[in-house]
């Protein structure tokens, strides 16, 4: 029922401030509560097709906005977007829609926060979808092997609007860094290097125990119980079929599979190095 907030507000308003003023204030507060709850209900009950469509469009809009943040869209940025569309096997109308969304995001007046708020509302209660979305945007941000200060600021806005704290975002960056050494992200970006405090450097060797721990978000000193728990959690969050059922566009299933393979490879390396099954 959409009027419980107003009714409750009316009763409380009259109780605390008898008369017309109390009733009006109560109705106003109740109306705001009804609107907030209504928005959450619409997000929770959004049908799968609506969620997939919005995920698809917002992904390319925000990607376009992000790549434009540093002042110009480079050839590498365009190649990344094109490669992503190829990987998703986008052709015909679907590819045209993705390209149009990318161009919309590049416009100076693109309402980034509004688009992200709508995306978050439709993904209500589905953090795994939000996580995949952020991982895709990180791919775009690091397409040319470096992170421009303006891109970093846009990423902070993206994280903020998606309900991700600064600490969580920094953790995502570390996990992203480790994953590049396993070929999962590198497959999208070519032979880019890893991240350090001084910037991105070209990798000169294969993945290390430290890289693998970054992927799982654990420390090398953690015991097998903690590592297995982190591994199972990540695999559950990146299960392709579950993600599609929750609203991930089917075209993006391949990316979810690659991420799951990256997590598995990191876990296998940790098991070998630490000697547990």
Swiss-Prot record:
**UniProt keywords, alphabetically:** Cell inner membrane, Cell membrane, Chaperone, Membrane, Transmembrane, Transmembrane helix
Cytoplasmic topological domain ranges are: 32-277
User: The J domain covers which part of the protein?
Assistant: 211-277
Please give the superkingdom of this protein's source.
Answer: Bacteria
Residues passing through the membrane, by range = 7-31
On whether DNA damage is a keyword of this UniProt record, the answer is no
Q: List the Periplasmic topological domains.
A: 1-6
Q: How does it sit in the membrane?
A: Single-pass type III membrane protein
Asked if Chaperone is a keyword of the record, the answer is: yes
Instruction: Give GO cellular component annotations, separated by semicolons.
Output: plasma membrane
Gene3D superfamilies xref list = DnaJ domain, TerB-like
Q: Which SUPFAM superfamilies match?
A: Chaperone J-domain
Assembly and partners are described as: Homodimer.
Q: What does this protein do?
A: Regulatory DnaK co-chaperone. Direct interaction between DnaK and DjlA is needed for the induction of the wcaABCDE operon, involved in the synthesis of a colanic acid polysaccharide capsule, possibly through activation of the RcsB/RcsC phosphotransfer signaling pathway. The colanic acid capsule may help the bacterium survive conditions outside the host.
What is recorded about the domains? The transmembrane domain is a dimerization domain.
Question: What is this protein's record name?
Answer: Co-chaperone protein DjlA
Supply the source organism for this entry: Yersinia pestis
The gene from which this protein is expressed is djlA
